[in-house]
A protein has these predicted regions:
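A glycine-rich helix N-cap at a beta->alpha junction
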Residues: 147-149
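ATP-dependent carboxylate-amine ligase catalytic core
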Residues: 2-15, 19, 25-114, 118, ...
Length: 149
């Protein structure tokens, strides 16, 4: 059985997703939890950092490039872990443009498929109340997605 999980995402690249991901991986690992890291999308640099922080290999979950059988086989790497954490790529809804609210292969699509709550990382430098409007906009854009914070 797959463990519960989280998706770390953001409105865009460069907002601190990797920093938050690495901090969570190391903190949970130091608490004695066996954490399975994943990267949503085709990134091959961040998974090496994930492995260093979690002491477990990180795997890519790319619903655009991988068929369902391969995605399921990769997800099976989390069997036996206490928790799975995936780091999104680009922005939460960014993927191959399709008709509808989210792009094909987006982190939102992966989070929904895995039933993982989303932690939205915001770079709020130079903002105050506007940061709340951004977070609210993301939550209302796709109300079926479970936002954890």
């Amino acid at each position: 059985m797959l463990p519960k999980g989280l998706m770390i995402s953001a409105p865009s690249s460069g907002t601190g997703k990797t920093t938050v991901m690495l901090g969570l991986l190391r903190a949970f690992s130091n608490m004695g939890l066996n954490v399975q890291p994943f990267k949503s999308g085709p990134d091959y640099i961040d998974p090496a950092f994930h492995e260093a922080a979690s002491r477990r290999p990180s795997f890519n979950l790319d619903s655009w490039a991988m068929d369902e059988a391969l995605l399921n086989a990769i997800c099976a790497q989390a069997v036996g872990a206490d928790l799975a954490i995936a780091e999104g790529s680009m922005g939460l809804f960014d993927g191959v443009a399709t008709k509808g609210a989210t792009g094909f292969g987006s982190s939102a699509e992966t989070a929904e498929r895995m039933d993982w709550p989303i932690i939205l990382v915001l770079d709020i430098s130079g903002q105050a109340q506007s940061a709340a409007a951004t977070a609210l906009g993301f939550a209302k854009y796709a109300p079926k997605l479970p936002f954890a914070g």
